[in-house]
Amino acid sequence: MSRLNLSFASCDYDHMRDLVSGKVRPEGIDLTPLTFDEPHLIFHQATHFSDFDVCELSFGRYVSLVSTGDNDKIALPVFPSRVPRIGALFVRAGSKIKRPEDLAGARVGLPEWAI
């Protein structure tokens, strides 16, 4: 069976180095890793030019694409650190939000949002 050729863009994260260096090889895949200094550079190239087969993409960027009708990307919930990066929500002092249920129907801010 032939192997699948995939380009993969990531930043130089310690938890991705073995994959990027080739020390860890995905079964059945010939991976061409591309490393970037900043995630926003990956996000820009991936969304404007579709330069990569696989890459990280912020949740904010993905949601903004889908909200404009751009359904060309498929999001996979893969968390190499084994947890989502956004582990907390911050609420304004004096807010009526005291429990997660209080967020139903509320607006939330994201650290990265592209329109």
Language-model-detected regions and their locations in the chain:
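Small-molecule-sensing regulatory modules
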Residues: 1-6
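Short, glycine-/small- and polar/acidic-enriched structural segments
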Residues: 7, 11-115
